[in-house]
Amino acid sequence: MTLEMSPEQIQESKIYREWGLTDEEYLKIKDEILDGRLPNFTETGMYAVMWSEHCCYKNSKPVLKKFPTTGPQVLMGPGEGAGVVDIGDDLAVVFKAESHNHPSYVEPYEGAATGSGGIIRDIFSMGARPIAILDSLRFGPIDNGKTRHIVDQVTAGIAGYGNCIGIPTVGGEVAFDESYAGNPLVNVMCVGLIEHKHIQKGQAKGVGNSIFYVGAKTGRDGIHGASFASKEFGSGSETQRSAVQVGDPFMEKLLLEACIEVIQNHGDILVGIQDMGAAGLVSSTSEMASKAGSGLRLNLDNVPQRETEMIPYEMMLSESQERMVLCVKKGHEQEIIDLFKKYDLDAVNIGQVTDDGFYTLYHKGEMVAHVPVDSLAEDAPTYYREAKVPERIQKFTDSEKYLPEITDSAVSEIFKKLLAQPTIASKKSIYETYDSRVMTNTVVAPGSDSAVLRVRGTNKALAMTTDCNARYLYLDPEKGGAIAVAEAARNIVASGGKPLAITDCLNFGNPEKPEQFWELTTAADGISRSCLALDTPVISGNVSLYNETNGSAILPTPMIGMVGLIENVKNITTQEFKKAGDLIVLVGQTFDDFSGSELQKMLIGEISGRIDFDLETEKINQDFVLKAITDGLVSSAHDLAEGGLAIALAESAFANGLGVDVKVDITNAQLFSETQGRFILSISPENQATFEKLLTESSVSGEVIGKVTDSGILEMNELSISTDEAVSIYEGALPALMK
């Protein structure tokens, strides 16, 4: 049980600093918001979590304004639980990504599991039925025992929650780097489908309307979780287990079905709905009121509790999982109670909407908080941080590109070593623990460029992916940010989809350090540039700052989640070569792009040098490939990323045990170059003439570089290895390293 302090003790002890408030912020609350009154224990706690970076984006809000957020396809952009994009036929796709980084280091299983649960609630709070989960994971070197434990438990947590709730985990990515050793990244994306008429908002309006608490009971878990996620890790952070929530996927399944039933069958009495996520009850209710310009009066005696003698501070800040807030029209309370009772869930009226603009709490007959509602939400402070270019950036910009030399005799061995690099090696051992086909909508499961799910009742499908190569951002945040969006779009296009929009998780270091803030704001410039060029507005997202341990920051890692629309299921394309005799086409030119590459990291143990990126060529190449696919000319498609051409060819050959015979006018090293904007396609010989005509008309650089064979040998210039041996290395590397 938490012991309350008096307002005077709070001021004297400055305990608010431990909760994340600065002296200046505390004085602003006291002098400007409360007109000289000292905030009490509950009020101070509420401001501490609501003014955390995790809740109010006080350091990143000016950066987020750079993003393009509108477009004819966007029905709802940032500001609600998730973004909503039209896909025709009166249907929309709803998606968002969230981070659960700090909790997943302290308690990897529960941290990852509750990260999944939270983002799922964001989706069904919009009225959508969740149809897919994706994850983007970053870990330290896998030869470290602590890292292996975190990998094992994080993936088990994601699998455990998704598998139990019955939502397929269909895709994602995993990468390893020293910078994540003390600060892993666990970003989870959820995608849902909805009819336009069921789209909801998180709002509390209409004087006298009732505020309902529904779902699981409140405990003491996760108190100050939002504050915990808004500061650097230090020597004692691993012991902060009370800041980590505990999830129950079976409870969430009941809550999901109950909320969907309310929305679809009782939508006329529902005013608003929102997940109780970060900062729990105070965040959800104050945000709902602030968005509607309302006030709220809540009676905490009615809050369902699973622990005894909880005080208002604990009830308001608890981040217990599987809870939602509903605003219900006055006079219809019993309908809500009866519906949730059917699911054996609490549904309790805890207050009413007012028109006084205040957030007022009562407990045991006494007023325990009375503050302007906007001061908790819309009027939280915003900081314009100093940005300073790190010294390393000028060095990289001025330097020559990294150019390795690889002899004919060495190229095959280097290829084998690349196949076994943890970031490149198959993640099959991870994604096989996920149920990727529950709900029976999954057409393309993990292992291809994008996951693809059919849209029942239509001839359409959705392609979805997550992407980010943080090494590029370390060398050049602007180009790296642009590349992250472009690679996500390449994955969608290679699957036969038209990119629609993105969500993001902006994982960066401490924004109070000018060099770290520069990385954030510069990466946002690059993301915006690609989003505008590729017509993929930012419709939702999350910011996770202070990803530093003992002063050492992670690589800047803005994870991009993207969804695309495949208008006709016949255009669904996968990366694997289909049959011997098909021609292999390389779309895009290959240059000496090794800075930040897997090859550079493997050969010299570090990354350095200048990187290049031609966004105009990227767009032209993507448009061409999508046109070729929709014209029915392409048998398989795979984008080129880490490891370059050689890795892409191998991955395309693996699934069906085929070989390749490739002769291309590039150096041995360029087989592993990571020049952007490239694709590997396979086409049937009878489509060659039509394909090459389209290639010429599109002014795209592309050429037939070889053919698919049934020899079981991968032959690429001087590189030669059996497909079986390559598959064994590729699929065996990660399980061997995890032992």
Curated annotation (Swiss-Prot):
One of its GO terms (cellular component) is cytoplasm. Its EC number is 6.3.5.3. Mg(2+) 2 binds at D122, D275. It is found in: Cytoplasm. It comes from the Bacteria. ATP binds at Y57, K96, D504, G541. The active site is at H54, H100. Pfam families: AIRS (PF00586), AIRS_C (PF02769), FGAR-AT_linker (PF18072). Pathway: Purine metabolism; IMP biosynthesis via de novo pathway; 5-amino-1-(5-phospho-D-ribosyl)imidazole from N(2)-formyl-N(1)-(5-phospho-D-ribosyl)glycinamide: step 1/2. Mg(2+) 1 binds at E98, N542. One of its GO terms (molecular function) is phosphoribosylformylglycinamidine synthase activity. It is an enzyme of class 6 (ligase). Monomer. Part of the FGAM synthase complex composed of 1 PurL, 1 PurQ and 2 PurS subunits. Part of the phosphoribosylformylglycinamidine synthase complex involved in the purines biosynthetic pathway. Catalyzes the ATP-dependent conversion of formylglycinamide ribonucleotide (FGAR) and glutamine to yield formylglycinamidine ribonucleotide (FGAM) and glutamate. The FGAM synthase complex is composed of three subunits. PurQ produces an ammonia molecule by converting glutamine to glutamate. PurL transfers the ammonia molecule to FGAR to form FGAM in an ATP-dependent manner. This is Phosphoribosylformylglycinamidine synthase subunit PurL. It comes from Lactococcus lactis subsp. lactis (strain IL1403) (Streptococcus lactis).
